[in-house]
């Protein structure tokens, strides 16, 4: 972490702090209420370290066009409850009301500004120069002394409130980013083998991309698949996964033929290192079937079967490092939760260094009471995968550049 300024690099007491967090959360489509608080709680340590500062929180929720693209007013209320401290909300990101509010703040006060993505400058600007000349940066930069970035789940984004201030004010890594980078770098640089990845859930494109990177780079020795990810690889192997399962992949993936072709290519090159389930539990019948037979068109592959659990658990038991992203099936329904429960429990019992990421993965771990038995439960989904895949991380690059510019 020597490349970044950390929170103990400066005396922040009495200072006005711009704190960029990621509290983007699922919203109940019926009631409009925030459904999870994990991302709020992840930032508590950083905020408490700023108890003697004036803290201005900047964040986003969803993106334009989505049903959950909402104001952050409710987010401020949720944060207030978690901190047991008033978090004032201002329905602007910049402007006269923000200026007046920040100028009247006392030490210990916390203010949350409006959803950054309500403003086109947040997502439309692509160059640092255009960001620095934006109303967002010009409107906010005169109000604060230091910029703290704690939004690990957004480190793969190059957006104005995330990277646009790096040459304007010292950019500092918050406690969450410090912890995330430390733990993930430990995993990345672990030289012990075997290393395995467990990839499940429904996000096929992400899992295929990470599979390709992990296998071609030699980062992992084996990949164990489950969920819709496994279904895609089975389809690529020429196995009849049934109409309902094919239709789900087609409906939820734009260029599904390209994805299946990519799966075929990976199987051709790394076939013995990509494991697919040998048996399944069907829904709604509840029948256990072999993966080699034809799956009835009216049935869903809802969970992995016992033979797969035994095979995967033996591999997990011998692993030295494990990355897991995505459940093995429809874990939310008790009848189809066994595969996820058994595989995640095997990881928890393992002596391997383990990292988990992705919203459904963390939700399943929490439901099973296993979160504290995983070495690191990351707040990042796409960000975690991108970082592990060796892609450029704009926020981390901004932190490095800012330290070079402002280091005395």
Curated annotation (Swiss-Prot):
GO terms for cellular component: cytosol. Gene3D superfamilies: Phosphoglycerate kinase, N-terminal domain. ATP binds at residues 332, 358-361. It is an enzyme of class 2 (transferase). It catalyses: (2R)-3-phosphoglycerate + ATP = (2R)-3-phospho-glyceroyl phosphate + ADP. One of its GO terms (biological process) is gluconeogenesis. The keyword Hydrolase does not apply. Keywords: ATP-binding, Cytoplasm, Glycolysis, Kinase, Nucleotide-binding, Transferase. Its main location: cytoplasm. Substrate binds at residues 22-24, 39, 60-63, 117, 157. The keyword Membrane does not apply. Its EC number is 2.7.2.3. GO terms for molecular function: ADP binding; ATP binding; phosphoglycerate kinase activity. Pathway: Carbohydrate degradation; glycolysis; pyruvate from D-glyceraldehyde 3-phosphate: step 2/5. It is found in: Cytoplasm. Belongs to the phosphoglycerate kinase family. HAMAP family: Phosphoglyc_kinase. Monomer. This is Phosphoglycerate kinase.
